[in-house]
Regions:
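Sec-dependent N-terminal signal peptides
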Residues: 4-13
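C-terminal segment of classical bacterial N-terminal signal peptides
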Residues: 13-19
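N-terminal module-boundary/linker segments of secreted carbohydrate-active enzymes
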Residues: 21-59, 281
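Acidic/histidine-rich, surface-exposed loop or edge segments in extracytoplasmic proteins
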Residues: 30-40, 120-129, 175, 265-266
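Soluble non-cytosolic domains of exported or imported proteins
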Residues: 32, 36, 44-48, 135-139, ...
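Conserved SGNH/GDSL esterase-like catalytic core that processes O-acyl groups on lipids
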Residues: 47-138
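Alpha-helical cap/lid subdomain in secreted, periplasmic
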Residues: 107-235, 248
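Conserved catalytic region of serine esterases and O-acyltransferases that act on ester linkages
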Residues: 226, 230-297
């Protein structure tokens, strides 16, 4: 019994030491709140991930989620920190209330969006071109976490991470040579960085969009690997899969539901999905949330 007690004490001390090394703690996702508020702070990949979330929420009968997007195209973690420190009105701030996006400001500061609501979840990410290069993450990620934690009106907010996805095989993105112009090399490097940041920061909630897109590419063929330009997701199955992943990783966990069976097909738009296409996206997202850093085969 004494040995067991000693082991428990040592484990508790180890956990405390790890948390101390991370600085400010993270907090778990809320459970069944009256209103859930999610803010994405990032770039155009944040847009790709969040754009179709209102459709999925509406189809699920969930009307008590407020969404916000603060983005600058191509914005790195380093630039996020510097834009905050200089209080630059460089962000586009859009918001969804009652499951409909509206543009709040095209000249917002980070604080304009951050202070607008008592956000429950704050989602960050690295710019795609350097998302597989961990030397680009620090010290900027630690500083950004401090900024968000210090300024958020909800002291118990969860800070989460969105994985970026690898480029299409034929992408002409100027930073693709950093990954040998190879999609699988880029995906592997991104996943290694994601696992490293879990060790180095208090973040433990990951939206595995990169793995979901890679799952979809493994299951189905597409001329540009579900991108519209070699790196941004296409407006049909690409963005839909990303939104499904956000839903499964965040919404489903908070409200104890699932993306499986969601009836949204983007009907009435040029991006309407067939049942088979939607189910493939659901499956790619669900598999990614079950296995975040490895393609499901």
């Amino acid at each position: 019994m004494k040995k067991i007690l000693i082991a428990i004490v040592l484990m508790a001390m180890a956990v405390t030491t790890v948390r101390a090394a991370h600085g400010a703690p993270n907090y778990p996702l809320p459970q069944n709140p009256d209103t859930l508020r999610i803010l994405g702070v990032g770039n155009s990949f944040t847009d790709d991930g969040m754009m179709y979330l209102p459709y999925l929420l509406q189809a699920a009968g969930i009307k008590n989620v407020v969404l916000g997007r603060l983005y600058i195209g191509g914005c790195t973690l380093e630039r996020q920190v510097k834009e905050y420190e200089n209080n630059n009105p460089a962000y586009v701030y859009t918001k969804s209330v009652n499951n409909k996006w509206t543009t709040v400001s095209k000249n917002a500061t980070m604080l304009d969006g951050l202070l607008d609501e008592k956000w429950d979840i704050l989602v960050v990410q690295q710019a795609s071109g350097v998302s597989g290069k961990y030397e680009s993450y620090q010290p900027w990620l630690d500083r950004l976490i401090e900024i968000l934690r210090f300024n958020c009106r909800n002291a118990g907010a969860t800070i989460a991470w969105q994985q970026t996805w690898a480029y299409s095989t034929d992408s002409n993105h100027p930073e693709y040579p950093n990954y040998e112009q190879n999609q699988l090399v880029m995906y592997k490097d991104i996943m290694e960085c994601n696992e490293q940041l879990l060790d180095d920061t208090p973040i433990d909630v990951v939206i595995p969009t990169g793995t979901a897109i890679q799952n979809l590419r493994t299951a189905m063929q597409d001329a540009r690997d579900f991108t519209r330009d070699g790196y941004h997701l296409n407006y049909k199955m690409g963005r839909y899969t990303a939104a499904c992943t956000w839903f499964q990783a965040l919404i489903a966990s908070v409200f104890r539901t699932t993306i499986e069976g969601n009836a949204s097909r983007l009907k009435g738009s040029s991006q309407a999905l067939t049942d088979a296409e939607a189910l493939a996206c659901h499956l790619a997202a669900r598999r990614a949330c079950a296995r975040r850093f490895k393609v499901w085969k």
